[in-house]
Amino acid sequence: QTPETPTIDSLVNVSNERADLARADRLWNAADTLKNILLIVTNADGSEEPLAIGLPGDREIDTRRLEAALYPRVARPFEEADFATHPGLIKGYIGPGALGRKSKSGIEFLTDPRVVRGTRWITGANIKGQHVYDLVSERDFESDGVIDVAEVFDGDPCASCGGTVSLARGIEIGHIFQLGRKY
């Protein structure tokens, strides 16, 4: 039972305050949680379908990376009306068990590359006021694929060279446009 914990911060605080949920080796942090974000994707033909993205709780979706990954489709956040059409999804307590093409909801579930086989997570239990601890990727839940749309932090591994990313301020001194692309 984790009542009144619909946000990552509140979940981490409760997890560290309660003796029955505390870790012996260190405190829980947002990176230990699996955040499941629901979107509505509009396809090129105008049809809409839900999409769920699971990523570590210390990350947010980078909208530019999301747009590039889904292009030419367009995404928007789930709204209250969308939750009304999917009563099995409890806002703030959504877990991967309710997601995926094979699930009852049938909602496509893509995960961040950091959610790899064998990693353990705290995530929603699909019941208001409840979360599941030590849910293991590929053992307790599976995704329908991988999507790399999380914001990038200084020190993250570089996907191209294997080194580490170093973020710095820059200035754009030119811009080349490619015909046929939306800008």
Where are these regions (language model features)?
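Extended, low-hydrophobicity, polar/charged segments
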Residues: 1-183
